[in-house]
Structure formats: structure tokens, C-alpha cells
Amino acid sequence: MKLDGSIAAVVTGGASGLGEGTARALAAQGVKVALFDMNAERGEAVAAEIGGIFCAVDVTSDEDVAAGFAKARAAHGQERLTVNCAGIATGQKTVSRKREDGSLRAHDMASFERTVRINLFGSFRVLSQSALGMASAEPMADGERGLIVNTASVAAQDGQIGQAAYSASKGGVYAMTLPVARDLSSEGIRVNTILPGIMWTPMMAGMDQKVQDALAAAIPFPKRLGTPADYASLVLHLAQNVYINGECIRLDGAIRLAPR
């Protein structure tokens, strides 16, 4: 896929973090970008800066996702690239003790379900609706109709203590990559997944610098946190290399997460 002004893209979670970095990188190539996010103020600002459009979308809502694609396609035409970056990170042990009195409690099921609903169901909802549109488009070079890039996490393979819900949600994204790529192969639609390691995102900004430095020191090489630019660079490569399909790629500086 040649990334230029003939290509339209949708980036979920595009108002911040990995999604924003990807949206900016695509726009720099001339790609017409639609941002799906719930943060309207930030999303509108980023869209204005990159010459894209913002669509207020909650990925857990069928109606929001359908309306977002309708708005994006009306403005830019059928997207050929969709990047799923919307997601949340949560932490709670399967069974834990309260610090106050040592009493036991089980993992909150509402929190578990919400994590899976956003990270896994949300990714598949966007993926399937984008693929539906791509399948109706005319093939490009090599017979390709489009590419969908999902975001899992190294926690899908190296889940830490307290990451049962998060690892399950990202593990689902990881596990569905190959079967979905096979499902869509006859339509000329590729599907790949990126498993980011410890990345600098707005969630990191509130952490003490010493904590950030310690996290960076644990990474074999390069000894720094990953950046949205690192992620975006891989998205661009996946778009341009048509032979990469059905793959889950770790982007982590060779780190393997310890139990805690």
C-alpha cells in the first residue's frame, strides 16, 4: 500500500498516545485521517492540526462506530487502513486482601467485563465494520483492499500480577489475529497486531520520574520507554509491506515482563 493522498485511514484512540502518534505520522505522508475518540476537545484539536476529521466514537457502541464510519467515509471515501488504538489499562488481582483488615475480596466482575468490552470487543467491532466497507471497494495493487492493525500488548504473553483482565482482553486481540486474517484473505484484506511493551503515553505522565527511569532501565535495548513514534513507524511499515499478514509483532526493546 502506497501511503499518499489517495489513501483514507481511521485511527481509534486517535486523540492521544499511540493513536495520536499514528495519526500524525499518516497525515505527514498525505493520508486522509479520521480520528475516532471520546475526547472531543483533544480530538478536534489534533484533527485540525493534521488536516483530518474527528468522529466522536465510543468503541463499545454499535451506533457510535457506525456513525463514525459514515462520517469518515462521507468526508474521505472508503478507508483502506484502520488502526485500533483505543483501549484501557486496569489492574486488580484475582483474589486480594484489603490492607485495612486483611479481608479477602474477589476481582470486581464489572471492571473485568468493562476491560474486555473496550479492549477486545471494541477492537473487533471496529475491525469487522471496517472490513465490511473494505470488502466492497475495488482492489488496489497486488489485489489488496485494505489493512487493519490492532493493538494488543506484551501482557498478552507476559501478563503480570494484577493483569488478569487486561491480559485476557489483549490476549483475545492477539489470538484472533490469524483467524481473522484468514477470514479476510479472500477479500484481499490484511490483519496484523502490534504488541507494545512499556510505552510512554499520557498514562505515564503522572508517574514520578524515578519510576519512569526504573522502567526504562529494565529494557534490554534501547534503554528507554517506547514512544508513539516507534509505534507509528511500525504501522507505516506494515502498510507498505503487503506480504506481512496475520502477524503479531512485539515492539518492546526485548523486554519480558516479570511477575510484578
List PLM regions with ranges.
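Alpha-helical segment proximal to the catalytic Tyr-Lys
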Residues: 132, 181-183
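Short, small/polar-rich loop/turn modules that mediate ligand/substrate recognition or access, typified
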Residues: 185, 190, 244-247
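C-terminal substrate-recognition "lid" of short-chain dehydrogenase/reductases
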Residues: 227-251, 256
